[in-house]
């Protein structure tokens, strides 16, 4: 017997930083389950806002990324969790306080520079490392990085 769970989330970027959440003693990316009547893109924005305290009006989806899959067995039921990921730009201020959603077990939210990612990813799930490495190797990211260097 198996069960499927669909979730959606994002790599949130601003300037040369990525937003991570701390959950279960690991750095992770904000995400959550799709609810009836809400599509994957909307879910990503809602979950990022709920889990980090960032205002949804300051979040813009730039691009759909690759999905990740997670498999586990719970009480004899095989669960497959598919997460649709989006590249999301935050156009608000870094001064806006990050508010971890403690009801979801999130203990911290923090912006990390691209240079700090090696250490952050050591404390992340393999699927998160894979996704972030995919993003960093995208032609889109390389153009984005070059654009930022001109400021």
Language-model segments: residues:
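N-terminal strand-loop-strand
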Residues: 1-30, 41
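Generic cytosolic/nucleocytoplasmic N-terminal low-complexity/intrinsically disordered segments
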Residues: 16, 22, 30, 63, ...
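Small/flexible residues
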Residues: 24-25, 83, 129
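Charged phosphate-binding loop/patch that engages nucleotide di/tri-phosphates or the phosphate backbone
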Residues: 120-151
């Amino acid at each position: 017997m198996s069960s499927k769970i669909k979730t959606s989330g994002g790599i949130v970027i601003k300037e040369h930083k990525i937003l991570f959440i701390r959950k279960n003693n690991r750095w992770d990316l904000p995400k959550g389950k799709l609810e009836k009547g809400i599509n994957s893109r909307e879910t990503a924005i809602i979950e990022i806002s709920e889990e980090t305290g960032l205002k949804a009006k300051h979040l813009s989806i730039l691009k759909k990324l690759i999905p990740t899959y997670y498999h586990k067995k719970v009480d004899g039921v095989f669960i497959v969790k598919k997460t649709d990921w989006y590249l999301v730009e935050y156009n608000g201020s870094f001064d806006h306080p990050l508010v971890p959603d403690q009801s979801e077990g999130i203990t911290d939210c923090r912006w990390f520079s691209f240079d700090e990612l090696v250490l952050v990813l050591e404390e992340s799930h393999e699927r998160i490392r894979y996704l972030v490495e995919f993003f960093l190797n995208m032609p889109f990211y390389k153009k984005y990085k070059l654009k930022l260097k001109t400021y």
